[in-house]
């Protein structure tokens, strides 16, 4: 617990029993016991130092790639969206960005400042922090090949600068020092033409809109692609395109997307995920691994 004096000294916004459905791209999820929007990096550090070290923590950006169960999260959510989003050009090829910066914003900023190589980030519906945590990718690009260094913070508020060799990077997974979260990154890009970079972003977003159910509540891609294949192909081949459970549905437009068609519950989405996994494994002997992270308790 935090002392009243410590709370008064914080500059961010502290909410209690905040419904997480309002903060996730699937529009589902029960309440967080505490929900904190830090004013800035210094405020975040002060908050972490004042927090009980045993308090469960969940870091939340745009709320994509995340399924919060209906019972909510029995701890503290730290929401970086619109808060830790500082961006700056550094030198001839460098770009510095805080973890709460939306990937699409980062891609546009890089293009505007004549840096190329980050255009694919425009197709990732999350923040840089989330992209770093899972090595997010789109249209053939991945996050970590751009990384020169990262800054992390632990639950005690200690900030560190780490190089990529401190992490094990894989396909849609990243393993690093335990108990640390991404605070910012230094990216290395190439000098280039703003007009060409903007045109590439426009083209990628048009491809995304043509192939994916943009505008409908989803988490983005639900499953990782298995080696040598595509999750969407396997799901469609199993006859699961359009499969429904309550208001949760496998998208008719892209089978690797599960959408909330109205008032789906997290339990329905989770059950549909497991149904898809079971049927694909039964038909093809392939166990699909989820990209989405499931957190919280199942029932209130």
Spans of features found by a protein language model:
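Beta-strand secondary-structure signal
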Residues: 35, 96, 149-151, 184-186
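Acidic/polar active-site rim loop that often engages polyanionic ligands
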Residues: 88-92, 131-132, 180-184
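Phosphate/pyrophosphate- and phosphate-bearing ligand-binding catalytic cores of soluble enzymes
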Residues: 15-16, 22, 28, 66, ...
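Residues embedded in well-ordered beta-strands within globular domains across many folds
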Residues: 88, 119, 151, 292-293
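Anion-binding (especially nucleotide phosphate/pyrophosphate-binding) glycine-rich loop
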Residues: 1-128, 138
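Glycine/threonine-rich beta-strand-loop-alpha-helix active-site module
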Residues: 115-120, 125-164
């Amino acid at each position: 617990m935090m002392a009243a004096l410590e709370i008064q000294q914080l500059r961010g916004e502290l909410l209690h029993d905040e419904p997480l459905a309002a903060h996730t791209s699937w529009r589902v999820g029960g309440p967080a016991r505490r929900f904190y929007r830090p004013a800035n990096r210094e405020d975040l550090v002060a908050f972490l130092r004042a927090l009980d070290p045993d308090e469960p923590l969940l870091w939340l950006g745009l709320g994509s790639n995340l399924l919060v169960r209906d019972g909510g999260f029995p701890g503290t959510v730290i929401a970086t969206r619109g808060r830790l989003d500082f961006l700056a050009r550094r030198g001839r090829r460098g770009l510095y960005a805080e973890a709460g910066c939306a990937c699409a914003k980062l891609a546009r900023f890089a293009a505007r400042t004549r840096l190329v190589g980050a255009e694919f980030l425009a197709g990732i519906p999350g923040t840089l922090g989330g992209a770093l945590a899972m090595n997010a990718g789109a249209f053939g690009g991945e996050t970590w090949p751009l990384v020169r260094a990262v800054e992390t913070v632990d639950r005690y508020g200690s900030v560190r600068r780490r190089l990529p060799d401190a992490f094990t990077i894989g396909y849609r997974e990243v393993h690093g020092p335990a108990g640390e979260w991404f605070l910012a990154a230094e990216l290395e890009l190439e000098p280039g033409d703003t007009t060409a970079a903007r045109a590439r972003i426009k083209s990628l977003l048009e491809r995304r809109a043509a192939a994916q159910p943009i505008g409908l509540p989803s988490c983005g891609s639900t499953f990782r692609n298995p080696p040598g294949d595509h999750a969407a192909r396997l799901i469609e081949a199993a006859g699961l395109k359009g499969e429904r459970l309550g208001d949760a549905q496998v998208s008719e437009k892209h089978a690797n997307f599960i959408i909330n068609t109205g008032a789906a519950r997290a339990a329905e989405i989770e059950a549909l995920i497991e149904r898809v996994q079971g049927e694909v494994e039964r038909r093809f002997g392939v166990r699909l691994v989820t990209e989405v992270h499931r957190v919280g308790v199942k029932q209130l």
